Design a protein with these regions (language model features):
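Conserved short histidine dyad/triad with adjacent acidic residue
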Residues: 26-43
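Short acidic-glycine-tyrosine-enriched beta hairpin
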Residues: 63-78
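Glycine- and acidic-residue-biased ligand/ion/polar-headgroup-sensing regions
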Residues: 45-56, 61
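Short, surface-exposed secondary-structure edge patches
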Residues: 29, 39, 48, 64-65
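A short, N-terminal "cap"/entry segment at the start of jelly-roll beta-barrel domains
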Residues: 1-26
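Ligand-binding loop in jelly-roll beta-barrel domains
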Residues: 78-102
Length: 104
């Protein structure tokens, strides 16, 4: 096989999984229930977030929280302060792509 296949977790439980981590890209899958999310942090690359399910609540730098529904794709610049979470009853499911891959 030329391709390499990766499998995402399908769950109702909090999930943060790195599916692909190579020299080109980091490709993550995340699932958050109401009140869950990531600790506040700064983006370590350009970040592309796709909302697969639910409503994303996100504050960037000093902005107020903005909300994005299923089907939204966000492009977030390198070194942006991020506060990512789910403030709604419906499960939030995201794909996060970091490109280029962050340098350690």
């Amino acid at each position: 096989m030329v391709e390499k296949v990766y499998n995402m977790t399908y769950s109702d439980k909090r999930t943060v999984e790195m599916l692909i981590s190579d020299e080109n890209v980091h490709y993550l899958h995340m699932i958050f229930n109401k009140g869950e999310g990531l600790p506040e942090h700064f983006s370590n690359s350009n970040v592309y977030m796709t909302v697969l399910k639910g409503i994303l609540s996100i504050a960037l730098n000093e902005q107020i929280i903005h909300e994005y529904e299923q089907g939204s794709v966000l492009k977030i610049p390198f070194k942006t302060k991020m506060n990512v979470g789910n403030k709604h009853d419906e499960i939030l499911e995201l794909i996060v792509v970091k490109a280029p891959a962050p340098v350690k």
